[in-house]
Amino acid sequence: MKHALASADKTKLAIDIINLLVKKNQDILVLIVVPTEVLKDQWFEKLVENNLLSNCKIEIINSAVKTPQVVDLLIIDEIHGVPSEHFVKIFEVIKYKLLLGLTGTLERLDGREALIKKYASVCDKVTIEEAEKNGWVSPLKEYVVMIKTDLTEYNELNKRFNAYFSYFGWDFQTAMKSVQDVFFRRKWCKENNLNFKEATAMTYDWMRCLRLRKQFVQSHPKKIEIARKIINARKDKKILTFSATIADAEKIGIGLVLHSKQSKKQNEKILEKFKTQSSSVLNTSKSCDVGVDIPELECGIILSVDSSKIRKGQRYGRLCRFSPGKKAELFTLIIAGTQEFGWWRNSKTSSNYVIIDEEQLDDILAGNEIQSRKIDDNSNINFRF
């Protein structure tokens, strides 16, 4: 399995491998499995460019997992998405001689990447730094903007959250299972001699505080304000924003909005319009995390942070896709003094970042040099909520 930066052109690597195999055996059959229609279309274009359609076919995993096939080489793009009870059957349904898995970030929050490793060990890993050094990606600098604001509401939510969380012995899995599964909750109450009605109230109060606390940091109005400031200072750039929700993406109010509530045809038109403009803004929630190829992107703004290395790697990859002479910027907006910084630290995939405040942001946007700082790269935060 190839473990590489999302934008280090995993597709090109796979195409090179297919070409080598075809030279040795012109009758070789390759099945390429992808998670989305967008990626299927991108692969099709690459296969046409390289005259490989006679040896290869592409299927979306939802369909591929239902149809037994025999192939010489099975390629699974974005293989980190396979470890579900349904999709993992792909390894049994498809009979293959060789397996190539492609991913930008294998590590998952649920640890289920271990299931993938049963079928495919990591054969190579390309870091962002190595990819940049070899000219496979464009240089990208991340600015982590620490935003100061009134935390009275957050601190009150945090206090209540911790009070409810202590009821579950500070065990995140127990608390979350109690929310999701009433049968688990009943069993847990019985085993611990707890009142079911009281446990139910604690469960939903804990979940409510968890949601409100996350909403406070990820959808804070000051992030919208600062995102607009960055956009106005980079009017000559192609800019992609990542928000927590569709509503937040729409609140930015500058440029285009791409989201799942619009029809596929509408989104295709919006994306095509954005691609053809020399400078523009595309606001998204999660719709551009995977499968969007816009090498001309020069600026990204992340308004919504979580602990996922996969999501961070995907978003990083959107920005540093290679384009001659390009130097990209990524602005990650964080509410200072909250757990959001811990989420960012757990998700970071590169050492090429600086931590700045709002005054330093103004200097950067004006093109001035700044004194910056980094955190200890060996430090670790074990909790993710």
Predicted region positions:
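Conserved segment of the helicase C-terminal RecA-like domain
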Residues: 318-347
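A short beta-strand element within the Helicase C-terminal
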Residues: 72-74, 283, 290-306, 311-312, ...
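Conserved helicase ATPase core of P-loop NTP-dependent helicases/translocases
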Residues: 41-45, 238-242, 247-292, 311
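Conserved Walker A/P-loop ATP-binding site and its immediately adjacent core
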Residues: 6-22, 26-47, 86, 246-247
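Conserved interdomain hinge at the start of the Helicase C-terminal
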Residues: 17-18, 156, 162-163, 211-251
